[in-house]
């Protein structure tokens, strides 16, 4: 069965006999030859396993170690949970499409759910990076005010607000996208349901959607990025005033990991969402990096340069090993 014949079964007739609407979509996915499908499946399985295991390990470490009680580690736990979920929204469906042609099919409702979940998690991560930058600004530039400003209650409230704003932001985009009429074709030239490739299939005017998407990038994403940049300008200025090189390195070390994460988060989406609507080539690589590779890299980025997290991981692994050894019967 070809993708064309599959797509023909994904439309249903409306009250108007001359008009059909799409009931399912066909995710064309990544471009690869059939003989390489098994290799790509194993590659994505490996990446997904590392992503989920790495992020859940960070989450478990932050939640169980009393030495990681600072707000920055509280927010790192939220980031790890977001990355594990973000990878879960996209990668399993990609892997299903690598196995069978039917694995590339997604229902209209399933597409809406995937789009909502992706933008909910990605938007929340965007706001979380801003909160993390503000946390570092207070810790370095306002150290005396920091314990009062970033107490446990404030951390919980700020994290909750980022999740609430992310959910609202995703709901707006999802409702605007799926209020449109989709009457064919049903081929999404992408590996998951995202706003630009889905809008290309709409049979009605998408001007409002495109304006809202550009406004979202201009106001939400750019606004968060500006706040992050301003925070780090003050941070760098404060770090440069520290007299010892060791003090400067200790103060700025957590910030370098955050800056790396911010760059990996912002650069690929800009390449995706700001390219012309008619352009499909070139979107795949940044999208794969943004949705699949970055969530895998974040645990390494935030642990390799952070001695506290590395020591906490060692304590957790050693404790787990001792418990498993003590529980095993003697030879």
Curated annotation (Swiss-Prot):
Q: Mind listing the GO biological process terms from this record?
A: detection of chemical stimulus involved in sensory perception of smell
Sites where a glycan is attached: 18
Pfam families recorded for this chain?
7tm_4
Q: Does the keyword Nucleotide-binding belong to this entry?
A: no
Q: Which GO terms describe its molecular function?
A: G protein-coupled receptor activity; olfactory receptor activity
Ranges facing Cytoplasmic side: 60-67, 135-153, 232-251, 305-331
Keyword annotations for this protein? Cell membrane, Disulfide bond, G-protein coupled receptor, Glycoprotein, Membrane, Olfaction, Receptor, Sensory transduction, Transducer, Transmembrane, Transmembrane helix
Q: Which residues lie on this side of the membrane: Extracellular?
A: 1-38, 89-113, 175-211, 273-283
Task: List locations, semicolon-separated.
Answer: Cell membrane
Q: Major place of localization?
A: membrane
Which membrane topology describes this protein?
Multi-pass membrane protein
Q: Which residues cross the membrane?
A: 39-59, 68-88, 114-134, 154-174, 212-231, 252-272, 284-304
According to the UniProt record, one GO cellular component term is: plasma membrane
Cystine pairs: 111-203
InterPro entries registered for this protein in UniProt: GPCR_Rhodpsn, GPCR_Rhodpsn_7TM, Olfact_rcpt, Olfactory_GPCR
Please explain the role this protein plays, according to its UniProt record. Answer: Odorant receptor.
State the protein's name.
Olfactory receptor 10S1
What organism is the protein native to?
Homo sapiens (Human)
Lineage runs: Eukaryota, Metazoa, Chordata, Craniata, Vertebrata
């Amino acid at each position: 069965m070809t993708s064309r014949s599959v797509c023909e079964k994904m439309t249903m007739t409306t009250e108007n006999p001359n008009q059909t609407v799409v009931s399912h979509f066909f995710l064309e996915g990544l471009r690869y030859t059939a003989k390489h499908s098994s290799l790509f499946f194993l590659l994505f399985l490996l990446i997904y396993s590392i992503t989920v295991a790495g992020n859940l390990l960070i989450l478990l470490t932050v939640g169980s170690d009393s030495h990681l009680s600072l707000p920055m580690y509280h927010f790192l736990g939220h980031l790890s949970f977001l990355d594990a979920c973000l990878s879960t929204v996209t990668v399993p469906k990609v892997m299903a499409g690598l196995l069978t042609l039917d694995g590339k099919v997604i229902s209209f409702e399933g597409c809406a759910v995937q789009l909502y979940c992706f933008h909910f998690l990605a938007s929340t991560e965007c706001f979380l990076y801003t909160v993390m930058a503000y946390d570092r600004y207070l810790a370095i530039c306002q150290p005396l005010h920091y314990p009062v400003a970033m107490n446990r209650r404030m951390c919980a409230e700020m994290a909750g607000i980022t999740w609430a704003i992310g959910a609202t932001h995703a709901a707006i985009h999802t409702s605007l996208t799926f209020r449109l009429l989709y009457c064919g074709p049903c081929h999404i030239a992408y590996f998951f349901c995202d706003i630009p490739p889905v809008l290309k299939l709409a049979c009605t005017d998408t001007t409002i959607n495109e304006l809202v998407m550009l406004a979202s990038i201009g106001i939400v994403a750019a606004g968060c990025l500006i706040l992050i940049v301003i925070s780090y300008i003050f941070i760098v200025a404060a770090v440069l005033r520290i007299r010892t090189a060791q003090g400067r390195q200790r103060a700025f070390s957590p910030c370098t990991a955050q800056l790396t994460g911010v760059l990996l988060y912002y650069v690929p989406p800009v390449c995706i969402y700001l390219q012309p609507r008619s352009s499909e080539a070139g979107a795949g690589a940044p999208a794969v990096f943004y949705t699949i590779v970055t969530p895998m890299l974040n645990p390494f980025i935030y642990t390799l340069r952070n001695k506290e997290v590395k020591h906490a991981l060692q304590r957790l692994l050693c404790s787990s090993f001792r418990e498993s050894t003590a529980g095993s019967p003697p030879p």
